[in-house]
């Protein structure tokens, strides 16, 4: 209105539409590649001008829309550029982030709560969406035409962490009904780091340690174990993993092998391995490193029983 000193016809609220890249299948949501009611994102206005917005919470509702109790309003007719991150971090005192968008305290991935590890730590980021008072929908979507794949047109949310996924099956010489998977352990990984909610950058911190993710069940069924990790490098370009199996209710067998990682864990990539538990070893096959989609198989890796 005229009272705002800008001379427009009154502020218009920004509405949000957000997609997750279609080849991303690892979120802890109902169908893995879309949002679930209650998911919340933090939205920023990244362009200069009268329209402001800093870490504004938009929450996905049961009707399939992002809504905000305090939405961003366009204060004039200028186009604005937006970014957003997930999961939303409440900052009522404006003291959790520095001016550049870095979370001041380390983000720690807690593997003691496996059911919540994926959803709580799947850091996503989107940027470059443009909207205005005349067209107030902020589209965190892919605006490429058919046949195009221009990064500057793809404003969808993308993963910034890394993921490693193990599928455990019974192999030769194993009675699946007597083999009860207990856990999978990663040796010497870092679970703390920084995230930047304005750029999507991550930075691993802290020291390396052994981390175990409990995943239990008899190998009569396929067992899947997933780790979300900070992107990180390894001194020896490899990672030691172990698989613990309770056999016949009285014997614990621990199998150990090493996974070559010449480039470490890279952000936005999924590392997938199939573990076949045998009578005296495990074999790792179907290994792939992808953009969290489908990749080519790599060679098998043998593992020895301890």
Each PLM stretch: what is its role?
Residues 11, 15, 38, 77, ...:
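N-terminal functional modules and adjacent low-complexity/disordered segments of proteins
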Residues 29, 97-99, 197-200, 272-273, ...:
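Surface-exposed beta-strand edges and their flanking turn/coil or helix-capping segments
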Residues 154, 158, 192, 279-281:
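Generic secondary-structure boundary/loop-capping signal
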Residues 171-172, 232-305:
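Exposed, polar/acidic Ser/Thr-rich sequence context and nearby capping/turn residues
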Residues 181-234, 238-266:
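Contiguous ligand/interfacial binding patches
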